[in-house]
């Protein structure tokens, strides 16, 4: 039998490699009962949208109920820095897994798909988001957020920022605090009395 672990084509994750344990993206695949496995990565190995495919086949031995195949993406035990998954946030990043248990090439999805949550890293930059155009007397909002190295809103901010504008803004506080667990703060009801 064999299996496929598939990823969506609309992703910027790196591709696994199996040759050099010191390089990025080093991936290991092992059977719990020491069955011999053959594997490779094929960016077009399955039907879209799940076309980026890691293919694993049992070529010597077999698996019984309870035996497992363990795949470690970005194995760091021998010096690899790991593997970069996609750089954008997702609550359920799926390792879409299909199995062909009796070697008929009729792949079936697992009833429960393995998934992880892709979260933002620590902030490396802070961004203020405002409307492009507003007239004097028209209300607007200001949103302030920390962004990680990939531009994702980070919920790991923990600081107080001083706010200063080049003209008088009604309702603008002197400071704003970004706390852990919150990815942005919005200040509503702001207004300028004159054009600037």
Regions found by a protein language model. Name each.
Residues 1-141, 149-151:
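Ser/Thr/Pro/Gly-rich, low-complexity intrinsically disordered stalk/linker tracts of secreted
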Residues 88-93, 139-141, 145-175:
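Short flexible loop/turn segments that cap and initiate beta-strands
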Residues 107-114, 154, 173, 184-187:
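Short Trp-Ser/Thr-centered turn/loop motifs at beta-strand boundaries
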Residues 165, 190-196:
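Short, intrinsically disordered, charge-balanced linker/junction segments flanking boundaries
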Residues 70-72, 184-190:
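Exposed aromatic-hydrophobic patches
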Residues 131-135, 175-179, 191-192:
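Alpha-helix capping and helix-loop boundary segments enriched in small/acidic/polar residues
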Residues 34-40, 44-46, 164-185:
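Low-complexity "stalk/linker" and mucin-like segments enriched in Ser/Thr/Pro/Ala/Gly
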Residues 65, 136, 155-156, 180, ...:
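Surface-exposed loops/turns
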């Amino acid at each position: 039998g064999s299996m496929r672990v598939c990823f969506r084509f609309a992703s910027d994750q790196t591709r696994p490699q199996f040759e050099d344990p010191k390089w990025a993206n080093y991936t290991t695949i092992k059977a719990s009962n020491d069955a011999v496995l053959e594997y490779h990565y094929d960016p077009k190995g399955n039907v879209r949208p799940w076309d980026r495919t890691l293919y694993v086949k049992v070529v010597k031995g077999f698996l019984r109920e309870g035996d497992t195949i363990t795949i470690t993406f970005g194995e760091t035990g021998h010096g690899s820095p790991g593997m970069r998954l996609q750089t954008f946030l997702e609550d359920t990043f799926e390792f879409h897994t299909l199995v062909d248990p009796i070697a008929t090439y009729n792949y079936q999805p697992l009833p429960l798909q393995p998934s992880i949550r892709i979260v933002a890293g620590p902030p490396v930059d802070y961004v203020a988001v405002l409307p492009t155009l507003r007239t004097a007397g028209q209300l607007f909002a200001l949103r302030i957020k920390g962004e990680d190295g990939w531009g994702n809103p980070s919920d790991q901010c923990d600081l107080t920022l001083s706010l200063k504008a080049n003209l008088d803004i009604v309702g603008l506080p002197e400071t704003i605090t970004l706390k852990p667990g919150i990815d942005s703060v919005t200040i509503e009801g702001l207004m300028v009395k004159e054009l600037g």
